[in-house]
Regions:
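C-terminal substrate-binding/catalytic lobe of Rossmann-fold NAD(P)-dependent oxidoreductases
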Residues: 3, 14-72, 157-160, 164-258
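Structural motif
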Residues: 80-81, 104
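Glycine-rich Rossmann-fold phosphate-binding loop(s) that bind the pyrophosphate
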Residues: 9-10
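A short, aliphatic-rich alpha-helical micro-motif
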Residues: 75-77, 99
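Rossmann-fold NAD(P)-binding glycine/threonine-rich loop
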Residues: 88-133
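Flexible, glycine/proline-enriched loop segments at strand-loop-helix junctions
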Residues: 84, 131-140, 180-187
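Short alpha-helices
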Residues: 128-153
């Protein structure tokens, strides 16, 4: 069994944990938390060993009646691979700790490509990550772009893509992130999404822009893709329908009528 440790059991980490438990060749040997937030209930219900991020956090957990199995370094030594789900731009700081322990690691979005050295999407460049000790999974927006554009690139060829990301502001619990009642543009052009897609689809010509809006629901992608050929709309829909993890929703209007 592959021993998996999850560093950061929050919005992403709890979903990763659920996926790992569905595998027949993996087991979760522990999760790391900085504080006993509401996500902890899922970890405790699943009987995951809990590790505090640092030693000085252990009494905090114990004051809530939570048994702590150690700290982050202890889990890193125990695991064969760490799934790093810590907040963006923080996870890369853990690389030296993972290397020192000889533990492989996967970063779940939020990090830049260059410090990690390899970016991964299961549909577009799976084989490129085979044998790597350290891999970065691209962000949710990059994943969405990749899963819809890659089939078009393979089947019809793409001359150019222009895309605008309408981004949700954060998760429901992140009330401090905003914007509250505004639309916040990303002033850098291209936004990071286009270059990020190119880390997993290197031959795609793409330019992106983004705005952030006050909702927690979802992201929206507005895409203009210039294909090398002109397929029928029905053929494009059939192609997407056959693509893993792409779902076509039909028959509902915004007002709820069919």
């Amino acid at each position: 069994m592959i021993k998996v440790g999850i560093n950061g059991y929050g919005t992403i980490g709890k979903r990763v944990a659920e996926a790992v438990t569905l595998q027949d060749d993996m087991e979760i040997v522990g999760i790391v938390k900085t504080k006993p937030t509401y996500e902890m209930k899922g970890a405790l219900d699943a009987n995951y060993p809990v590790f505090a991020s640092t030693k000085n956090k252990i009494p905090f957990f114990e004051s809530y009646g939570i048994n702590v199995s150690g700290v982050t370094e202890d889990l890193v030594k125990k695991a064969d691979v760490i799934i790093d789900c810590t907040p963006g731009k923080l996870g890369v700081n853990n690389m030296d700790m993972y290397k020192k322990a000889g533990t492989k690691a996967i970063w779940q979005g939020g990090e830049k490509h260059d410090p990690i050295g390899a970016s991964f999407n299961s549909l577009t460049n799976y084989s490129e990550s085979i044998g790597k000790d350290y891999v970065r999974v691209v962000s949710c927006n990059t994943t969405g772009l990749s899963r819809t554009l890659y089939p078009l690139l393979n089947e019809y060829g793409i001359d150019n893509v222009q895309a605008v990301m309408v981004r949700r502001s954060g998760d429901p619990k992140d009330s401090d992130r905003g914007p509250i009642n505004s639309i916040e543009p990303v002033l850098n052009v291209p936004s990071h999404h286009g270059p990020d897609v190119q880390t997993v689809i290197s031959n795609l010509n793409i330019q992106t822009m983004a705005v952030k809006v006050p909702t927690t629901i979802m992201h929206v992608h507005c895409i203009v893709a210039e294909l090398e050929s002109e397929p029928e709309v029905s053929k494009v829909l059939e192609l997407w329908d056959a693509t893993p993890r792409v779902n076509l929703i039909e028959g509902f209007l915004a007002n709820g009528e069919s």
